[in-house]
């Protein structure tokens, strides 16, 4: 309910966000076996070698608004903890409650205080993560411009950095495609999570011989998609995250029309 309430995702998508967080935790259970070191007898005359894998310390996770459960509690936190580290999460500005609620569940499950820590702050205040000597690494998901800044700044301070940034996905549709199934897939990829995800599909390149047929099928399915609030479980798509983002979407649509695009829906 927390994901749907603060993010606006349709109910099924919100459930999927949480389930993916659980899957990430299950996968992290196998991490300790990957942490085993290696030994080599008689590497050279009179010498044996032994290697150990040890925790680095404190990591910082900078979370996006679009997957407030899956990314911090499925991708970032479980592996970090399983490898013996602790983490400080910068909660997403627009969706902080879900992250906090899952941290409460970790505590209820017996996780010691101080292993997961959550802060709410602006992006400018979060700059301290990039230079603080106690932070050994950064994991980030978000925009490309911010990701490049985080990568360059944190790396220059000797930190390990993961930065998953924006994507520009394309679909290539050939004339032997099953039209209905392809149209359904494009609808799901384009409108899922109101398009607010890195797996969203903004471009489809279609073989000319089937272009009109596919467009008609997509329009028909899009018209049937119910837009509504997340608490209505029959809603197929919820709102975008805020008014500013809505304006951005409208501006891109208008720009496309100005440049010759035909609006079919």
Regions found by a protein language model. Give the residues of each.
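N-terminal Rossmann-like NAD(P)+-binding subdomain of aldehyde/semialdehyde dehydrogenases
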Residues: 1-47, 241
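Phosphate-coordinating loops and pocket residues in cytosolic domains that bind phosphorylated ligands
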Residues: 4-5, 16, 131, 152, ...
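Catalytic cores of large soluble enzymes that bind and process phosphate-bearing ligands
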Residues: 6, 10-13, 17, 91-94, ...
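Conserved helix-loop functional segments at active or binding sites
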Residues: 31-38, 108, 188, 192, ...
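Rossmann-like NAD(P) dinucleotide-binding subdomain of oxidoreductase/dehydrogenase enzymes
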Residues: 37-181
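ALDH superfamily catalytic-core signature
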Residues: 145-265
